Amino acid sequence: MKIYGKNVALEALKGNKKIHKIYLSNKFKDEEILSLIERKKISTKLLDNRELDKMCKGLHQGIILEVEDIKTYSFDEIIPNITTEYPLIVILDHLEDPHNLGAIVRSSEAFGVDAIIIPNDRSVQITSTVVKTSVGTIEKVKIVNVPNINNAIRKLKDLGYWIVGTDMEGTNYTEIDYKTKIGLVIGNEGKGISKVTADNCDYIAKIPMKGTVNSLNASVACGIFLSEINRSRGI
C-alpha cells in the first residue's frame, strides 16, 4: 500500500516497517527524514509535485512511501491473550469514514486501548487515508478483523467483558463503573449502533450536551469516552 505525509513517513522510518520504495518531491528538504532514508538505504525516486499529486489524493507533503500492508489480526490471535489489568477494546459498528477510523486509532493509541475490532464487510478498512489521519499510530494499535461484530461481542462477554454502547439516549457516561474488562461500541456515523448490537450491550451510555447539537462525530465521542474511562480508572 502507499502511505504519505511527513509524520507518517517518520513513524515508518523509525520503526521496523518494510518499505519497498519512497517517492520524494525534488524540493523535499526534511533533513531528519532524508538522513533516515540514506541510513536505511531505501530505494527512492525524485518526482515533481504534480506527479506526486497524481499518485495520491491527500496532502502528501512531498513524500509517498510504498510499504507492506498494515497487519491485522483475528479475534483469537489477540483478544484472549490480553494481559492488562483492565482490558479496553473499541468495537466499531460499521463505520464508513476513513478519517473517523484514523482519528479513533490515534485516540486509542493515546489512551492505551488494547485492540480495535472492525467488521470485515460494510465497514471502512485500513487505507492510506486512515494511516495518514492516525499520524502513523496505526502501527502501534492492534486491529482485529471479525466476520460479525455481534458474534465478537458474545465472545467478549464469555471472556468477562462488559459491553458499553454509545448513544444519545442512555445512562450518563460518567456513572458507569469502568474498573473491569470493557468493550466500547462506537456506532455508524449516520445510523449509530444497530438495534441488534444495542441489544447485546450491557449498558447504553450517553454524553450529556447542553447545546442545540444532539450528536457528536464518532471519533470525537470515542475520544471523550476513552478519556473518561482512563480518568475513572485513575490514569
Whereabouts are the PLM-identified features?
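Structured adenosyl-cofactor binding patch, chiefly the S-adenosyl-L-methionine
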Residues: L10, G15-N16, K132-V135, A198-I235
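Short beta->alpha connector loops at strand-helix junctions that form conserved
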Residues: D48, D93, P119-N120, V141, ...
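A short acidic, often aromatic-flanked loop/helix-cap motif at beta-alpha or helix-coil junctions
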Residues: R50-M55, T72-Y73, I149-I153, T171-Y173, ...
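Short, glycine/polar-rich helix-capping loops at beta-to-alpha or helix-loop-helix junctions
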Residues: K29, S123-T129, K191-T197
